[in-house]
C-alpha cells in the first residue's frame, strides 16, 4: 500500500538536498568563488559568474524536484551532473587535492573522497526515485520557465557579483615609503624584495593572520601572481604576534611570498586599518589601492608584467 509513495519521498528528499547544497554555497559564496578561481581555468570575473551559475543550477533542480515538474528531464540532468562531478572529484583525488570541495560550501567540509561517496549515495536515491511520475497540471511550461528564471536570479540578487558593483576607487592610503623603510630598520633580516621597493613594481598586502577576508584576498593575489609568474614582487605585511602566520601562509598557499610582521603602531601608521588593504607600488609610489571586493585581476596582471600603465 505504501510502495507508490516511496519514489515520491525520495524525489522530495533529493530536491531538498539540492536546495541545501545551493544555499550552503550561497551563504559562503566568497569561499566558493575563490575555490573556483584557484583552478586557474577562469578569470576572476568569470569565476564570480560561474559560481552563481552553479548555485542557481542546483537551486533550479531542487525546485523542480520538489514541485514535480518535468521529473524525467530533471532526473536525467541530475544523473549526468552527478556523473560529471564524480569524474571531476576523482581527478582531484588522483592529483592529491584533499581540500574541501565546496559541495556544501564552507558550512559542511568534505574532501573529494567524502564527496564521491556522497554522490554515489545521491545516485542511489535518484535510482530509487525513478518510478515517480511527473505532475500533470495547468501552466506547467510557464511554471517551469519561471522556476528557472527565479533559481538563476536569486544568487545574483542575494549576492551580486563583485564585478557588477561600483566601488569608490579613490586612492586613500597612509602609506609612506620613507616611513616604511624606517620601520624596516628594526629588522635584522629583511627580505631582499622589501629593500627594492623603490626600484621595482610591487604589490604590498596589509593583512591580519586571523582575518578570513584577508585570507581570501591573498588567495586571489596568489593566483594572479602565479599567472604573472611574479611571486617575488608580492609582499605580505602582518601585524601583531607571529603565532598564526604559518597557518595563514599554509592555508593561502603563499609560503613563497616574502613577508614581515610590523608592530601594531607601525602597521596602522602605514595602512588605513581597513584590511585587507592591497597597494600597487610603482617605485614606492601608490598608484592603486584595493580592498577585498574591488580587486581587478587584469590591472594587477598588467602591473606585475609591466605591459601597460594602469
Task: Give the role of each language-model region.
Residues 89-116:
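Interfacial helix-loop-helix junctions of multi-pass membrane proteins
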Residues 193-215, 221, 227, 237:
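Short active-site neighborhood of thiol/selenol oxidoreductases, capturing the structured segment around
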Residues 252-277:
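Short, internal strand/loop/helix patches
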Amino acid at each position: 500500500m505504501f510502495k507508490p509513495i516511496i519514489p515520491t519521498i525520495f524525489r522530495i528528499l533529493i530536491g531538498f538536498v539540492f536546495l541545501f547544497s545551493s544555499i550552503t554555497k550561497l551563504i559562503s559564496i566568497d569561499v566558493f568563488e575563490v575555490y573556483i578561481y584557484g583552478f586557474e581555468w577562469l578569470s576572476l570575473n568569470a569565476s564570480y559568474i560561474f559560481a552563481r551559475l552553479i548555485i542557481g543550477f542546483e537551486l533550479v533542480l531542487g525546485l523542480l524536484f520538489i514541485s514535480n515538474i518535468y521529473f524525467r528531464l530533471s532526473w536525467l540532468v541530475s544523473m549526468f551532473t552527478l556523473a560529471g562531478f564524480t569524474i571531476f572529484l576523482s581527478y582531484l583525488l588522483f592529483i592529491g587535492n584533499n581540500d574541501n570541495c565546496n559541495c556544501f560550501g564552507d558550512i559542511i567540509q568534505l574532501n573529494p573522497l567524502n564527496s564521491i561517496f556522497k554522490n554515489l549515495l545521491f545516485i542511489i536515491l535518484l535510482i530509487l526515485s525513478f518510478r515517480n511520475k511527473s505532475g500533470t497540471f495547468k501552466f506547467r511550461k510557464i511554471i517551469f520557465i519561471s522556476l528557472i528564471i527565479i533559481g538563476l536570479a536569486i544568487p545574483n540578487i542575494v549576492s551580486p557579483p563583485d564585478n557588477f558593483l561600483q566601488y569608490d576607487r579613490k586612492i586613500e592610503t597612509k602609506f609612506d615609503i620613507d616611513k616604511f623603510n624606517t620601520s624596516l630598520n628594526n629588522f635584522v633580516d629583511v627580505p631582499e624584495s622589501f629593500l627594492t621597493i623603490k626600484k621595482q613594481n610591487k604589490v604590498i598586502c596589509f593583512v591580519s593572520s586571523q582575518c578570513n577576508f584577508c585570507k581570501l584576498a591573498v588567495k586571489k593575489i596568489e593566483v594572479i601572481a602565479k599567472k604573472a609568474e611574479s611571486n617575488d614582487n608580492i609582499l605580505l605585511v602582518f601585524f601583531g604576534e607571529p603565532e598564526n602566520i604559518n597557518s595563514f601562509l599554509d592555508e593561502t598557499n603563499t609560503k613563497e611570498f616574502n613577508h614581515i610582521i610590523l608592530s601594531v603602531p607601525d602597521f596602522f601608521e602605514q595602512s588605513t586599518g581597513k584590511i585587507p588593504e592591497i597597494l600597487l607600488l610603482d617605485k614606492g609610489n601608490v598608484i592603486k589601492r584595493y580592498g577585498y571586493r574591488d580587486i581587478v585581476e587584469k590591472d594587477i596582471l598588467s602591473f606585475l608584467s609591466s605591459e601597460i600603465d594602469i
